[in-house]
Swiss-Prot record:
Keywords: Cytoplasm, Folate-binding, tRNA processing. It holds the Pfam family YgfZ_barrel. It is found in: Cytoplasm. The keyword Zinc does not apply. One of its GO terms (cellular component) is cytoplasm. It comes from Blochmanniella pennsylvanica (strain BPEN). This is tRNA-modifying protein YgfZ. Its main location: cytoplasm. Folate binds at residues 28, 192.
């Protein structure tokens, strides 16, 4: 197994200010699935329509428990005949695969986490122009995934154009790095996390797994749920919430300012979000999914909040020192 690639980290930068950057995605992993039953198996478990998934596109998807609560979210796509794959957070991969295998006893499908696959993000100024020096064809809004001999490229349009590369040979990565060294910056997965937060892509950790329905974390907005396909795990609860209007939670990104000279603890997944009531009391209204420090003195926090909250409101995060005046917006 290759050692996981991790570039030296620095403070993440908002997409509008991001120079051309290579980003190591050491917090994500690739999972391969192959066998004659692979399409039907995933179709019966994931929220998206696997049977009608275009081979030139990937889809956002959620894997849920029988109650419709999301175990994890992922990108799923075709690799080649009778082989599919998905990308998800590394720290939830083991749990998610174990849950998936419970319903695969009679399916002819093999599931293999591919820890040798190298995942790299490329984002920032002129990312497409730079990649075009190495690849004759790049993915776009119409064809969101492209396969070459040693690299698969995924296109993401939000918050600005960026690319996710699945590299099968270390020598290919070395070549890209050697040829790009003078033109790019490097960062670790925190930069990709911040871009996902800007884009409204939920980041589910083990502690927040199985807490939310997919609609509470934008999976319907991201076209990660099909309401026209046949039965899948959790479908009854997910459909009921859509058609009866029961979704009382939604995804937000909070913005806060901190004194970078002090030794703060960033909000952590699972921390509680509280709303100030009548300028004196605090009420629990949500849960933290993820946070990151932007540049030196800004904090972004991805949270799930009750829909009943009015904007703007004064919020704080419990169990941390960074809990004052976090104003929320989409």
């Amino acid at each position: 197994m290759f050692p996981r690639v991790a570039f030296l980290g620095q403070y993440p930068v908002p997409s509008k200010d991001l120079p051309l950057t290579f980003i190591s995605l050491e917090e994500w992993t690739l999972v391969r699935l192959h066998g004659p039953d692979v399409i039907q198996c995933l179709h019966n478990q994931f929220t998206c329509d696997i049977q009608n998934l275009n081979k030139h596109k990937y889809s956002f998807a959620a894997h849920c428990n029988p109650k419709g609560k999301m175990i994890s979210n992922l990108y799923v796509f075709h690799l080649k005949n009778q082989e599919m794959a998905f990308i998800e957070r590394l720290n939830i991969c083991k749990k998610q695969i174990e849950e998936m295998k419970k319903y695969m006893v009679f399916s002819n499908v093999t599931v293999i986490p591919d820890y040798n696959a190298i995942l790299i993000g490329i984002a920032g100024t002129n990312a497409r122009n730079h990649l075009s020096m190495f690849f004759s064809v790049l993915p776009n809004k119409t064809h969101t995934i492209i396969h070459t001999q040693d690299v698969t490229l995924l296109y993401l349009s939000s918050p600005s154009e960026r690319f996710l590369l699945i590299i099968n040979k270390k020598s290919v990565l070395d070549y890209l790095l050697n040829e790009s060294q003078s033109q790019i910056q490097f960062n670790d997965s925190r930069q990709w996390v911040s871009l996902d937060m800007e884009a409204g892509y939920p980041i589910i950790e083990p502690i927040t797994s199985e807490l939310f329905i997919p609609q509470a974390v934008n999976m319907d907005i991201l076209d990660g749920i099909s309401f026209n396909k046949g039965c899948y795990i959790g479908q009854e609860s997910i459909a009921r919430i859509k058609y009866r209007g029961y979704n009382k939670q939604t995804l937000y990104r909070l913005n806060g300012v901190m004194d970078y000279k002090k030794n703060y603890n960033l909000p952590a997944a699972g921390d509680q979000v509280e709303l100030k009531i009548n300028n004196q009391h605090w009420k629990n209204v949500g849960i933290v999914l993820q946070s990151c420090q932007i540049k030196k003195d800004n904090i972004w926090v991805q949270v799930v909040l009750n829909r009943s909250i009015l904007e703007p409101s004064e919020l704080r995060i419990t169990n941390t020192q960074t809990h004052d005046n976090l104003m929320f917006y989409y």
